[in-house]
């Protein structure tokens, strides 16, 4: 779970990211031809642990973009952003923002796993036993742990927005469809949440309720 994934896989096997990024840019150019609209793809660099990982891959992505632009004789407009999945990333937020990452998304599933050293795939019986013994009251993979993982997210937001107030921040995974978690995200001024398609109606309703409650509390 913790080794050859995300940006690490890209760095070890450069042909993978080259193929993926090239496909994104070529598809964007073709989409512009078909629709007549400007397409701006957003390329995510996942599982960032250090700033150098991000800057290394950012440069490589830019090289692929230039290569495709020359081949297709078409300038590509794109954005590069990062997925935040490791606790360490919370403490280098301002450095990542400074290195021209324009968007960030918290992958709260992996952030929960790496913060608590729990795997959602094989800890079901453990969590059930913990709830039975009142060691925990809720499943942290269903409802965001605001005191642990939530604290990391708050630190990250503060550091990132201190560097750039306009930075776009959001979360993805099933916490994005949990009403209580959405209320927490709204209070911390995240720009968006993402979740499985079947949870989207719940997410929209919960986001609206969270915003209404926030406005009421300010009056």
Task: For the regions a language model picked out, list residue spans one by one.
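Conserved alpha/beta-domain cores
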Residues: 1-219
